[in-house]
């Protein structure tokens, strides 16, 4: 899952639209805004944080008129999702696809069952857009997994 916009620079007072994307290798489809899936969805600019005011089914999931200059971050954190694996083989196939290493051995060493076990996962996404002068710096929002730009690309 990732956040995607058509353009990464806009003029101030212009509308910014951002889609939630589901897929792999940056190929995927748009997902509408579903509040029951969202723990946090906000945007931040110039040290201020604003909640996203989307409604069920909105696509794009984010559409906001940005009135100030500055580097702008849109952040999405999902609620936990659960996936049941009937067999270890199914889990190993997933782990190999994601290149996670020798998970079967780790799984066993932690005393987890070989059948009918549950994976809990969350999704974290952030997109950076330059608005107007695009001044400012990226911020560490404390996501469990997060890239932080060391330099402003705009």
Predicted regions mapped to residue ranges:
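N-terminal soluble domains immediately following signal/targeting peptides that reside
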Residues: 1-154
